[in-house]
Amino acid sequence: MFATACPSNREAIYGMLATSPVKPQGVTASNGSAFMVAPGILITAAHCVHIETNPNKSVHNKFELIRAPDIGQKMESATLIAFDKKKDLALLKIDEPRSTACLKLLKATVPPGTPCGSLGFPLASVSFNPSGIGFNLIERFQGANISAFVVATDPIGNKISFYETDSLMYGGSSGCPGFIASGEVFGMNNRSAIEGTGDNPKESGAGNRTRLAISMWVTSMDIVAFASTNGVVL
């Protein structure tokens, strides 16, 4: 079902490496996926642009991106335009991108039961060595179904909305776009919920099987609104 959408969408999907110096002579890094939504403009998860992926810490000061078809080439430098910790969205800009291929964002909700897919760089790893930083990426597809479009109220009374899908994503999937069979994007993955049946999370076996495993997605409508607020019309 997604064999047609994946080759097209991968043209606009990137691995992101964010770094900052730490005393005395070290470097700290975060990583995630990102996708281009307008020429040179990319969306990723806000927590991925913060040190230790912690929204309560400072943002990194260096951002580099590599497009899926360009793996093995030199990474492209980007600047952070804006971020919204509540929505968990961030905008990055590449001044002179190698490619301007973009993904199309849906501007209406997708009904529950719709098959969906995701493409990006979960399970990526960063290594530090004398010659520099190694960023190890494998492009991965994941499939699921949309289980709910949730409208809720946060602890301070603000309305929030997000999608739920019915399968757990690989670790490190933040920033991956979620799309339907046409390739159009319904959201961006930013978190998952896992709940087991056992009392002791260290125990395994029938008494501690996972009984809840869902993934949550920032909606495409929120992405469009966030981009518009920051001068990017999608």
Model-derived segments and their meaning:
Residues 94-101:
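Short, structured beta-strand/loop micro-motifs enriched in basic residues and often containing a Trp
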